[in-house]
Amino acid sequence: MGWLLDFLYPPTCPHCGCPVKEQGTWCPSCLDKVLDIRFLQADQLEGLDGLWILGRYQGGLRSLIHDVKFNDKSSQAACVKPFLFTFDQAHCLPPINLVLPIPISQAKRQVRGYNQVDLFFKEWVQDRADYYNWQWLDALIKETSQGDMWHMSQLERKRHVDKLFNIKKEYLQALEGKELLLVDDIYTTGATLVAAAHILRQAGA
């Protein structure tokens, strides 16, 4: 089926459109401009042990995320695989038990039909579940939404995300004493991740 798909829809770079070998891959030039695996120390992020960033939010990567979130192009989410593959090769992660996606509001999910974070990361986690003993756990609830935060100042973001998340009651016990990996699509100030980490630590994670 893969060869038929490639025949009918020849694989192209998601940004510049030039031919590539496989669906979901980038041309070297476009990938080099946005691939940027780096680590931020924990002292910059209250409640977190650290933060891995996979790419620069610009150019082709910015367009890709925007299309998945706002232009109903969910199939484009597969184009993050080169970033996750490169991250895998670096063997960066400490031992973890559970991987939790940052949720979107119920209103946005009803409009969009999915949480883009699931599309970017869930398959990657499930493919490695046996090897790493990971479990994908959709344990967080986003209680409300007051619009997108990309235009807000750091102080406005902090006020916005305070008490923004809650934990699904059926998962409270499962979180106790566990090492967690939070995944999200965009990192700006870290306020969203810090807010999620705060409530998870209160639950004993």
Predicted regions and their residues:
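Glycine-rich phosphate/pyrophosphate-handling loop used in enzymes and phosphotransfer proteins
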Residues: 1-205
